[in-house]
A protein has these predicted regions:
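Aromatic sugar-binding surface patches on proteins
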Residues: 810-814
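Bacterial Sec-dependent N-terminal signal peptides
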Residues: 1-25
C-alpha cells in the first residue's frame, strides 16, 4: 500500500507559526460559468475558480471571501489564453463536478470540497489533501497537496543545495546574503515555479513572502500571509513541454548580443581607467580571449548619478573608444537608489515624488545603503519614473558603454528578519507585496528605456534580484557566493554553483553566470589557489555568460596564478570560443523555447530516475555532457552517462556505454566532457574576441550514428547585436550525416531564412570521427581529390575554391573541405 504524505507552499510573513482552524471543512454548493472561467461557490461564501488557459494549463484561484479580486495585475503572467478551448462543459454528478479537456480530467468534489486533476488516461496527477486542501485564517492561506512516495520536484529558480527539492523547504523573499553558504535560503531571486516527475508544474503567482515544503513534515503545506492564492497547474508530457507552457504564460527570454557569450573580467574595485587599460592589455598581450570588462559600483561619482568618478577616469570616452578598438565591451553597474550626498539628483527625485515613501510619515524613505551613505529608493512601479531614469541611464551609453549590471535590487541589505522596511510604500502597494518584484520593475525600466533610446540594439543587462518573468527583460548571475572561512575552502561553493545554475535555468534564467572564483574571501596565496582557480575557470567556461569576479581589490586575472594555471585557464576559455557557433545556436533555442543551454540530465532523460541526483554534472545543449571537477586534488571524476553511446570529447576516441556510472581521468589540464554518438558539433577558430574576424571557416565535428541512423544539427546565424532575431532576420543551415552500410551520406541543405546575409565567402570543414578509411569521396556525384591532412587546412580563411579530403589513420579522422555556397550539397563517403 502506498502511503501518501503532503507537500506545501507556504507564504508566511505576519505569523511565524500556523494556528489550526477547526472549521475548515468546506462544501461546494453550486457553480457559475463565464467564458474560460468556472467558479465553484462554497457554503461559507468562499470560491474556487478554475480558468482554462489551454487544454493542459489551468489557473486555480481559491478565494476565502469569494471576491476573487487582486490589488495588482500579475507582474509575471502576460498571457492567459494560450490556445482556444472552445465551450467548456461542466458535468455535474452526485458527488462532484467534472471538466474534461483533450488532455485533462478536472474533478471538484462537493463535500468535503477538494480538487483533483487526472490525465486523459485517468492517472491521478495532482490532488488536494482530503478535507484540508484549502485552509485560511484571516489573510493567511494554506494549500495542502498529496505527495506520492516516488514523487520528486525540481525548480524554484536560483536555490542552493541539491536539485531534487523533495524533503526540503524553501522561502521566497529576495534577500541580500553576502557570502552565502551552500545551504543558504532564501537568496536573491524569487521564482515560485517548480515541476514534478508526475508530469506537471506549478507556478504560484503571489509576490508576498511564500514558503514551499516538499515532504519536510508529517503534514506539509504551502501558505500565504496575504494576497490571493492564485496558481497555475501546467501539464506536459515531459519537463520540456511544461517549460514551454510556462513560457507561454510569462514570456520568452530575450536573446543576448553574441559578444555576451564570451568571457568577462571583473573585480570589486575595478573602478578606474588605469586598471581597465592594464587588464585589457594583459589579455591581448597573452592571447587569452576576452570580450567584456566590467566596472563595479565605484565607477560613479555618487549613487546613482551615472557620472564617471573624477580622478578615476581621466577621459572616459577615449578609454571606451580605445577599448572598443581592442575588441572590448564595457559593462557598468547601477544601483536602484539615489544617495543623499548626490544632493541635486536626490532633491529632484524627492520633489517629483519618485522615491518610495515611508508610510509612517509620508516622506521619502531613508534607506541605509552598504556604501554611499543613506539613500532614497527609486519607485520603479511609478510610471513617470521610467523616462526620468532612462535619461540619466543614457549618459554612459552615449559615452560608449555596452550594457548594465543591475546590482543590489533586493533592495540591498534586505533579509527576511528585517521587518522595519515593511513601512515602505510604493506606488503599486506596500513593501510586503512589492518587495519580491522590486528588482523586476527596475529591470523592466532599464531594458525598455535602453531599447527606446537605442533602437534596434540588443540590451545587455545582468541582474541579481528578480521575480518570475525576468526573462523578458534581463539575464542573471547567482550573486555573492561565499567560500567559507578561507577562500581556499571554496571547493564546496564551486560544487554548489552547478545545481544553483541548473535550477536557475529551469526557472527561465537560461543566460546566467556565477561569480567565477567565488565572490568572497581575500586571496593571500595565489599559488595555493591555482588548482581551485583552474577548476573554477573550467566550470565557468560552460556558464552561458562567463564572468570572472571577486570581492574587493583581489585581482583574479588568469596570469596571476602561475604559468600552469594560466595555461589551463586559457585552454578552457579557448574551448568556449571554439564552441560559440554551437552555443549561439542554443541561445536561439532558449529564445524560442525557454530551454536552458546548461541543462540538468533529467531534462533530456526524464524517465531515468538516476538523473534526479546528478548534481555534479550537466548537459550543455543536447549533444555534450560536462562533469566539472569540484574536489581538491581530484584527478578522476565519477560520471553518470545516460542512455546511448558517449565519446570522450577531449580525445575523441574513448567510447563509453550509457546508463551507468563510470570513473574517468580528470587531469588538471582539462574538464571531463563527453559527446553523444550521433552528434554534429559546429566550431569556429579561436579569436581574441567574438567579432575579431567577420569571416571565418566553420568546422563541423561529426560523430556518426550507428548504421541506419543519423547525426544532425541545424546551425543558426544572425547579425549578433540587433533585434533582427525578433523579426525572423536569420538563417539556418541543416546538416545531416546518415550512416550507411558502406559509408556516410553527408547532406548540407541550402540555407533557410531571409533578412540576414552570411559574411563570406567562407569554407566548411567536416571532421568525421570514423575509424574506417574511406575509399573515395564524391560531392554531387563527382570525385574530389585526396590530400595530406596537414595540407587540407592550409589557407582555410582565404582559399574558398579548393574541394578536397584527407584521412588521418593515426586519429581515425576523415576531413572534407568544401566552399560554403549556401546551396544543397551532398557528400558520399565510401569505405574501402
Amino acid at each position: 500500500m502506498i502511503r501518501y504524505r503532503l507537500w506545501v507552499w507556504v507564504l508566511c510573513l505576519v505569523f511565524p507559526t500556523w494556528v489550526w482552524a477547526e472549521n475548515e471543512t468546506r462544501t461546494c454548493t453550486s457553480f457559475t460559468q463565464q467564458g474560460r472561467q468556472v467558479t465553484f461557490h462554497l457554503a461559507d461564501s468562499a470560491a474556487l475558480q478554475l480558468q482554462l488557459c489551454s487544454s493542459s494549463v489551468v489557473k486555480i484561484w481559491f478565494s476565502p471571501d469569494g471576491q476573487l479580486q487582486r490589488r495588482n495585475a500579475s507582474f509575471a503572467v502576460i498571457n492567459e489564453e494560450l490556445e482556444e478551448v472552445g465551450t467548456i462543459h461542466v458535468d455535474e454528478q452526485a458527488a462532484c463536478y467534472e471538466i474534461f479537456t483533450p488532455k485533462l480530467r478536472i474533478r471538484v468534489n462537493k463535500s468535503p470540497m477538494s480538487l483533483q486533476i487526472f490525465d486523459k488516461y485517468q492517472k491521478l496527477l495532482f490532488s488536494d489533501y482530503a478535507d484540508k486542501g484549502h485552509v485560511s485564517e484571516g489573510t493567511k492561506k494554506v494549500e495542502y497537496k498529496v505527495l506520492r512516495r516516488d514523487e520528486h520536484f525540481f525548480g524554484l529558480g536560483e536555490k542552493a543545495g541539491k536539485m531534487d527539492r523533495r524533503g526540503e523547504s524553501y522561502k521566497m523573499w529576495n534577500s541580500d546574503k553576502p557570502c552565502y553558504s551552500v545551504v543558504e535560503d532564501p537568496l536573491y531571486k524569487s521564482i515560485p515555479f517548480f515541476m514534478s516527475n508526475y508530469r506537471y508544474g506549478i507556478f504560484l503567482d503571489n509576490t508576498y513572502k511564500t514558503e514551499f515544503k516538499f515532504g519536510t513534515e508529517s503534514r506539509d503545506y504551502f501558505e500565504a500571509p496575504n494576497g490571493e492564492m492564485v496558481y497555475y497547474f501546467i501539464f506536459g508530457k515531459d519537463y520540456k513541454e511544461i517549460i514551454s507552457q510556462y513560457v507561454g504564460l510569462t514570456g520568452k527570454p530575450i536573446m543576448p548580443p553574441k559578444w555576451a557569450l564570451g568571457f568577462a573580467q571583473c573585480r570589486g574595485l575595478l573602478t578606474s581607467e588605469k586598471l581597465s587599460r592594464e587588464i585589457a592589455e594583459g589579455y591581448r598581450k597573452r592571447g587569452i580571449p576576452c570580450d567584456i570588462i566590467y566596472q563595479d559600483i565605484g565607477w560613479t561619482e555618487y549613487l546613482q548619478d551615472f557620472e564617471w568618478r573624477k580622478g578615476n577616469y581621466e577621459n572616459p570616452k577615449k578609454m571606451l573608444s580605445d577599448l572598443k578598438e581592442m575588441g572590448f565591451k564595457v559593462v557598468v553597474s547601477q544601483d536602484p537608489v539615489i544617495a543623499q550626498a548626490n544632493k541635486k539628483q536626490w532633491e529632484e527625485a524627492d520633489r517629483l515624488g519618485y522615491f518610495v515613501k515611508d508610510n509612517t510619515n509620508g516622506k521619502s524613505y531613508d534607506m541605509p545603503w552598504p556604501w554611499g551613505g543613506n539613500c532614497g529608493v527609486v519607485d520603479f512601479t511609478l510610471p513617470a519614473v521610467a523616462d526620468w531614469w532612462g535619461t540619466y541611464q543614457q549618459k554612459p551609453i552615449d559615452d560608449g558603454i555596452s550594457g548594465f549590471w543591475t546590482d543590489m535590487g533586493e533592495p540591498a541589505w534586505s533579509n527576511e528578519e528585517q521587518t522595519e522596511r515593511l513601512v515602505m510604500k510604493h506606488h503599486l502597494g506596500m513593501h510586503d507585496e512589492i518587495h519580491n518584484v522590486y528588482g523586476l520593475t527596475w529591470d523592466k525600466v532599464v531594458k525598455e528605456q535602453f531599447e527606446k533610446r537605442n533602437p534596434d540594439r540588443r540590451v545587455f543587462q545582468m541582474t541579481r534580484a528578480a521575480y518570475a518573468g525576468l526573462q523578458r527583460y534581463t539575464f542573471g548571475w547567482t550573486g555573492d557566493s561565499g567560500n567559507g572561512d578561507d577562500v581556499l575552502q571554496g571547493w564546496g561553493q564551486l560544487a554548489n554553483q552547478i545545481p544553483v545554475m541548473l535550477s536557475a535555468g529551469l526557472g527561465l534564467i537560461p543566460f546566467s553566470s556565477c561569480d567565477i572564483t567565488g565572490y568572497c574571501g581575500d586571496i593571500e596565496d595565489y599559488p595555493a589557489m591555482a588548482e581551485l582557480y583552474t577548476r573554477w575557470i573550467q566550470f565557468g567556461a560552460f556558464n552561458p555568460l562567463s564572468r570572472i569576479h571577486h570581492e574587493g581589490d583581489n585581482p583574479v586575472e588568469p596570469w596571476l596564478f602561475g604559468p600552469e594555471a594560466e595555461k589551463n585557464a586559457k585552454a578552457a576559455i579557448e574551448l568556449k570560443y571554439r564552441l560559440l557557433p554551437y552555443i549561439y545556436t542554443y541561445a536561439r533555442e532558449a529564445y524560442d523555447t525557454g530551454l536552458p543551454i546548461m541543462r540538468p540530465l533529467f531534462l533530456e532523460y526524464p524517465m531515468d530516475m538516476e538523473t534526479f541526483s546528478t548534481d555534479a554534472q550537466f548537459l550543455f545543449g543536447r549533444e555534450l555532457l560536462v562533469a566539472p571537477v569540484v574536489k581538491k586534488g581530484a584527478r578522476t571524476k565519477n560520471v553518470y552517462l545516460p542512455e546511448g553511446t558517449w565519446i570522450d570529447y577531449n580525445n575523441k576516441q574513448t567510447v563509453y556505454t550509457g546508463e551507468q556510472w563510470t570513473t574517468v581521468d580528470a587531469p588538471l589540464s582539462s574538464i571531463p566532457m563527453f559527446v553523444k554518438q550521433g552528434s554534429i558539433i559546429p566550431t569556429m577558430p579561436v579569436m581574441n574576441y567574438t567579432h575579431e574576424k567577420p569571416v571565418y571557416p566553420l568546422t563541423f565535428e561529426v560523430f556518426p550514428a550507428q548504421e541506419g541512423a543519423q547525426a544532425a544539427f541545424t546551425l543558426y546565424e544572425d547579425e549578433g547585436e540587433d533585434l533582427g532575431y525578433q523579426r525572423d532576420e536569420f538563417v539556418k543551415t541543416p546538416i545531416i550525416c546518415s550512416t550507411l552500410a558502406n559509408g556516410y551520406e553527408l547532406t548540407v541543405s541550402a540555407r533557410e531564412g531571409k533578412g540576414y546575409t552570411v559574411p563570406g565567402p567562407r569554407n566548411l570543414l567536416f571532421r568525421i570521427y570514423s575509424a574506417k578509411a574511406p575509399k573515395e569521396i564524391t560531392v554531387k556525384g563527382k570525385k574530389i581529390k585526396k590530400t595530406k591532412p596537414e595540407r587540407l587546412e592550409e589557407d582555410l580563411e582565404n582559399d574558398t575554391e579548393t574541394v578536397a579530403w584527407s584521412w588521418d589513420k593515426e586519429t581515425g579522422v576523415c576531413s572534407v573541405r568544401i566552399p560554403d555556397k549556401g546551396i544543397d550539397e551532398k557528400l558520399m563517403i565510401t569505405f574501402k
